[in-house]
Amino acid sequence: MLRFLEVVSEHIKNLRNHIDLETVGEMIKLIDSARSIFVIGAGRSGYIAKAFAMRLMHLGYTVYVVGETVTPRITDQDVLVAISGSGETTSVVNISKKAKDIGSKLVAVTGKRDSSLAKMADVVMVVKGKMKQERDEILSQLAPLGTMFELTAMIFLDALVAEIMMQKHLTEKDLEARHAVLE
């Protein structure tokens, strides 16, 4: 357990040391200029996308999760945030392509800059973390499959939320006003 926490801590330090602040600014600009924000991810990356969508809603954005029954049509005034460690997840790549064909902006959060998802994106945030296709015997025993990418992506997106809060001078109280009460 302690070894796992050490590995996670190292990945967070790596994220901090390699974060591209210019790309962060571009992401925020796209999010701010969008009529609506749509998020997508498959499997555990999908859970990360949903958590990010919740925080965007708390910040006051209009946000939808792709695949939910109440999700409307995406338009050329919207942005899609797509999360995929490999950048090759079939459903994520196909839906991202469709969004681009419609004229939507695309933000890719991925571990691979040369992936299909990254190549079609308007903004690419590379988040390093072992993907499920990579084999590292020690790391695979501690954090199997895409665990490190998923955790690192979640931390990055929460840091992005904190940055937006600071830029907009929002407080936890502001976010709390939009928090669910029907629980």
Curated annotation (Swiss-Prot):
Domain of life where this protein originates: Archaea
Any single Pfam family the record assigns to this protein: SIS
Gene Ontology biological-process annotations: carbohydrate derivative metabolic process
GO molecular function: carbohydrate derivative binding; isomerase activity
SIS domain segment(s): 27-170
CDD domains per the UniProt record, alphabetical: SIS_PHI
PANTHER family: 3-HEXULOSE-6-PHOSPHATE ISOMERASE
Family membership noted in the UniProt record: Belongs to the SIS family. PHI subfamily.
Name this polypeptide is given: Uncharacterized protein AF_1796
Lineage: Archaea, Methanobacteriati, Methanobacteriota, Archaeoglobi, Archaeoglobales
